[in-house]
Amino acid sequence: QPPTLALFYLYHTLLDGDSDVLWCEYLMDRGVLDRAVFEPRNRAIEAGYKAGTVGVLEFCGFYVGTLAGRTPAQWQPLREDFLHERIVPRLLAAGRACIEAHRRDGHELVLTTATNHFLTELTAAALGIGHLIATECDIGIDGRFSGAVAGTPNMREGKVARLSEWLAARGRKLA
């Protein structure tokens, strides 16, 4: 009998906030993104998504696009600083307690999030969660993030599809 899965959603359950929003704010504060250009585009994409005129792929792609043009190694120092400065202080005590309760019960812990894997893998590690299902970033043949989503975004109905794929890779399926 495989262990019971404990699936955790990140935003406003384990984290006070949204990683994509926090990442963009962090990049604007560091001057990596031009606030005068990026903020209006961000507001427009969020409004379009809420209005139903922007789809999941375009929405996720907008945030994945913040990584475009650099390699994972080039982003690493900023990613680590982002984790310690913006994420760790916002990890909720109640969320950590819930994780620990499931861990004590022997459950298999899985973090599932629409934010990209590159940003959230450090968050999963900081929470002691060994499995992460997240939106994947495309990396070009030059080793740089292309700015595109790879595969199905882990958002809305894509979360069920991605969980099913994750389970199938482990010889399991949704009940």
Regions found by a protein language model. Give the residues of each.
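C-terminal cap/substrate-recognition subdomain and adjoining C-terminal extension
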Residues: 3, 77-80, 84-175
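Electropositive phosphate-/nucleotide-binding environments in soluble metabolic enzymes
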Residues: 17, 39, 53, 57, ...
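An amphipathic alpha-helix signature
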Residues: 20-21, 72, 76
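Acidic/polar active-site rim loop that often engages polyanionic ligands
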Residues: 20-23, 59-60, 142-148
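A general alpha-helix detector
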Residues: 22-23, 44, 58-62, 78
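Helix N-cap/coil-helix junction residues
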Residues: 32-33, 53, 129, 172
